């Protein structure tokens, strides 16, 4: 064998660990690379073998025949054989080397040989410790991304690329922007290490494929047009958009038209059988998103159609895997662009409702909302519930989307279309007395719309939206009260124990709940979103479900999304990642700070979707609608100072304010007017709109100079400067900063990798990363940090620029 290293045996698609301990011929060295990294069934054999060979060949070239043991220690291969008795760990120099070194005297040649051996020994030790780190439990996805970005060794990069297969999908998905940005803008070795994982996941998940295609397009847009056309990012995007990465199991199932054998699995787990509605849904809004047939005969004969040859169209032979979803997204973006041309909010709202009504004719279809965290099909958009959001120059809008949850998007048939007037047939059931009908029984039937009166016109489709605006109060039936008390009495009799109830406590709690029910906002033509956002989410879900022809289905869900056109959401995505990382750090360090990062979908360099924050309205809307100070609004919503509800809301306010103050300080978030700060029903504040972070500011003026926004109104809610909650706020700030700087590298690398090849304004200037690191104050003691926090809090609270900027926003945009 000479000095050759044993070739690793190819990986088999099995979940069993790599065979054999070191020294057992085939597979021994492969186990070095894969030992302790989890299930191997997801690792592509060629990828693993290539990575293994590159690592071992690199080690061999550097160290002249030195391999690595399964323990991660460097081994000297005597005569090329990996025999245990002849393997020596180089952590301690072998006796032969020590004897040779003693014999080497004053000659230059002998000195050179001695230095070479020492360098070889040191390099081997470094390789030993590196591999030990890679195989340890401490090696997480954050460290993998760091080594992939910083390492210049192709072998290490290949190993990390292979190791990606062993992390959880959701962990890798968090760093997808970083992985794709490295693929686009870094050298070929990094790209070659990343690509196998991306291709593998694209075959597994259509949603992952969509996000990769969108991000590759958005991050390639910063390149010169001639370079972009031939870049590796553009080529990978074209590969994803083609049907070459369609899951293999779908291709194999195409010829089969007969029903799958009943194996005891649920229908969604059996082999997918195309129905007519499924087939037609693969066509777009113009040619790919075509609605399912609305013929009642078709809708009632799904089982017949599932095995019919007429259910097959040419969608399988043409590259349309992502086409319906892309057309769906294009339609939503086109609506936003058309709305921006209209002068008034009222006109925009009317046009939005009309556009969405037309879009409903194309649904259900094989489309989904990428911001959701579960598989589903979009079946309906309740168009009358959509609202246009506040924006001076653009027209972002909020829509609610009805979906049917499914186990697997690729293999589940598209639901059949249910006509809007189908809801009329439920009237007769509604007239039945409710006594004796459980909540679950009502939810499982079509009878979900309250019987308001006997006027048939109340059920017309055109009037559903009006009925949904202001629902009359639903009075509890007397028989419901009887049933409830009967259950209570039976329970107490079975216990055979006397039940003592503090009547005073009951009266106090009931009076608090009745007196401090959350207030509703009035309709404002200039701000139509205020009423929609103020309505409690659960109430909105119930109301929309009652008016939906799909609401009776048990897997019905309601989602919401904000559609933005003309805005670059890549900075928003970067801010989301940093805040999400900070949230994880504080949870790990058990610091009770509260922030709520919301999901961002980058569609292009100037469009995207945002996950709305439910049960929350902006402080501007609060002040405009209530005409109260922030503290008085808290008292109105949650009760007096001593009530449990107020104290809980106050604590939530303090914990969230401290969390966002730290996040805004580290990211240098600007444009902090009251329209960009939300207040939820539980008292938390949530910052939104991170279009100006790090090196960028509105109009590049750098006007907001304070570390973060902390107004006297915020301090009043905390109980004033001398209050315990204000001291608690400063303590949380200190604890949060100490915890964050322990994990500084995890935060900094998110930003540093995205700076590669980027033209985003937040990266203008050469000192962006250096300034970010300085804000962690790594050289300060905890006592010095405490003094720093005191200074930042005091400076932000007294900042004249914050007051001037709020005044400027009020004068120019009417933001209170």
UniProtKB/Swiss-Prot annotation:
Q: Where is this region: Interaction with ACBD3?
A: 2-68
Cofactor(s) needed: Mg(2+); Mn(2+)
Q: Which UniProt keywords apply?
A: Acetylation, ATP-binding, Endoplasmic reticulum, Golgi apparatus, Kinase, Lipid metabolism, Membrane, Mitochondrion, Mitochondrion outer membrane, Nucleotide-binding, Phosphoprotein, Transferase
EC number(s) stated in the UniProt entry for this protein: 2.7.1.67
Q: Which SUPFAM superfamilies match?
A: Protein kinase-like (PK-like)
Q: Where do the record's region annotations for Catalytic loop lie?
A: 668-676
- GO BP field: inner ear development; phosphatidylinositol phosphate biosynthetic process; phosphatidylinositol-mediated signaling
Residues where Phosphoserine is found: 258, 266, 275, 277, 284, 294, 428, 511
Q: What is this protein called?
A: Phosphatidylinositol 4-kinase beta
* Organism of this sequence: Bos taurus
Q: Gene name, please?
A: PI4KB
